[in-house]
């Protein structure tokens, strides 16, 4: 990539938000809010914003009495975008968790625009119904009702959007939202991920690799669901949901209107897993990423992604060792130090201060010398 093109894209990509699925944004914000409320704030940090303006953001005190980041950040599960952000820069992802309330107006506007484009695409497929919820069980019940309503459409080779996926991967529950599923002219089930761009240029190769990993994870989880590899017991264990909790009145009313005879979350979970098992849905055959310019809604290009299961599993295993507390977070190698130029956390980055960029480069040479 030419230097000028890299400069155009680095500002957007180095933020860590350019790969965030707008579908998962609200869920991610909810998780961050619950994490922040349970954390103990320490002294504030001033982070450099655009044009070197200081933006004050709380510095969350790291607790030393917990054994893993999952516990420190009070997380019951991870999002697919958590792992894809690790693929960009793991250290940046960690700072994003620690400074969960830090979002510049520019990035907020980018996310809002992207969400609007996603919403327009979704309304092309189906209407949206607002369902008031009163508990986390209700929130998950709505996800399950969405799955139940989409299964028949997939069985009849229709097109769906915003399909919730979840599976236990390497001992951690991984959750996401598939942007679109449809069948090609040859009858193959294809996943399409919409990526909106603030600049009218395609992303760098490094960004594309992160996007490839993200859609590959979606396929990995979806395939596990339709193959019966995901269990209700695992889901309940990780989310700490109460299967005996009665559904809220609005959720119950919506379920009954859909023809589902359920009273509790457990009834709904049982129905979802039974439907997935008996649906005979195919595995995802192809993966496609569509890049769209936010300002004009122009399609900038599409990328077909080859699914490499062995590589995906290897990356997931490595990333999960951080979440399970088996290693410290890592930053980028020196070859990708350009990512740091517009990173909001560059001035406080422990990876840079500890010489991580250099050591990551020298380590292979040391090994060869032995």
From Swiss-Prot:
PANTHER family: EXONUCLEASE V. Belongs to the EXO5 family. Single-stranded DNA (ssDNA) bidirectional exonuclease involved in DNA repair. Probably involved in DNA repair following ultraviolet (UV) irradiation and interstrand cross-links (ICLs) damage. Has both 5'-3' and 3'-5' exonuclease activities with a strong preference for 5'-ends. Acts as a sliding exonuclease that loads at ssDNA ends and then slides along the ssDNA prior to cutting; however the sliding and the 3'-5' exonuclease activities are abolished upon binding to the replication protein A (RPA) complex that enforces 5'-directionality activity. This is Exonuclease V. The keyword Cell cycle does not apply. Its EC number is 3.1.-.-. One of its GO terms (cellular component) is nucleus. Its main location: nucleus. Its cofactor is [4Fe-4S] cluster; Mg(2+). The keyword DNA-binding applies. Monomer; monomeric form has weak exonuclease activity. Homodimer; homodimeric form is unsure but has much higher exonuclease activity, suggesting that it could homodimerize upon DNA-binding. Interacts with the replication protein A (RPA) complex. It is found in: Nucleus; Cytoplasm, Cytosol. Binds 1 [4Fe-4S] cluster. GO terms for biological process: interstrand cross-link repair. Residues 1-52 are annotated as: Disordered. Keywords: 4Fe-4S, Cytoplasm, DNA damage, DNA repair, DNA-binding, Exonuclease, Hydrolase, Iron, Iron-sulfur, Magnesium, Metal-binding, Nuclease, Nucleus. The gene is EXO5. Residues 1-11, 21-32 have a biased composition (Acidic residues). It holds the Pfam family Exo5. [4Fe-4S] cluster binds at residues 89, 340, 343, 349. One of its GO terms (molecular function) is DNA binding.
């Amino acid at each position: 990539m030419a230097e000028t093109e890299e400069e155009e894209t680095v500002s957007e990509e180095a933020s860590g938000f350019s790969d965030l699925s707008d579908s998962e944004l609200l869920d991610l914000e909810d998780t961050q809010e619950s994490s922040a409320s349970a954390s103990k704030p320490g002294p504030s940090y001033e982070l450099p914003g655009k044009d070197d303006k200081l933006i004050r953001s709380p510095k969350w005190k790291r607790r030393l009495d917990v054994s893993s980041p999952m516990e420190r950040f009070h997380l019951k599960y991870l999002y697919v975008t958590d792992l894809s952000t690790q693929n960009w820069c793991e250290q940046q992802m960690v700072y994003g968790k620690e400074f969960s309330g830090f979002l510049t107006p520019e990035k907020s506007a980018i996310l809002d625009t992207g969400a609007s484009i996603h919403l327009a695409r979704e309304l092309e497929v189906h209407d949206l119904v607002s369902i008031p919820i009163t508990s986390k069980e209700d929130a998950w019940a709505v996800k399950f009702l969405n799955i139940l309503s989409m299964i028949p459409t997939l069985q009849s080779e229709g097109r769906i959007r915003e399909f919730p996926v979840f599976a236990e991967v390497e001992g951690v529950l991984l959750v996401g939202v598939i942007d679109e599923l449809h069948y090609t002219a040859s009858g193959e089930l294809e996943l399409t991920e919409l990526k909106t761009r603030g600049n009218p240029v395609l992303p760098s190769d490094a960004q594309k690799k992160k996007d490839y990993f993200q859609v590959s994870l979606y396929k990995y989880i979806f395939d596990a669901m339709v193959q019966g590899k995901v269990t209700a017991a695992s889901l309940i264990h990780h989310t700490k949901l109460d299967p005996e909790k009665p559904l809220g009145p609005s959720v119950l009313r919506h379920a009954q209107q859909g023809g589902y005879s359920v009273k509790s979350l457990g009834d709904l979970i049982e129905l979802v897993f039974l439907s997935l098992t008996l649906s005979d849905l195919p595995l995802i055959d192809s993966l496609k990423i569509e890049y769209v310019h936010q300002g004009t809604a122009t399609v900038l290009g599409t990328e077909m992604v080859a699914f490499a299961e062995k590589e995906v599993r290897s990356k997931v295993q490595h990333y999960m060792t951080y979440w399970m507390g088996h290693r410290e977070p890592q930053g980028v190698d020196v070859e990708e130090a350009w990512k740091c130029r517009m990173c909001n956390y560059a001035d406080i980055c422990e990876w840079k201060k500890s010489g991580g960029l250099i050591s990551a480069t020298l380590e292979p040479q040391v090994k060869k010398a032995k």
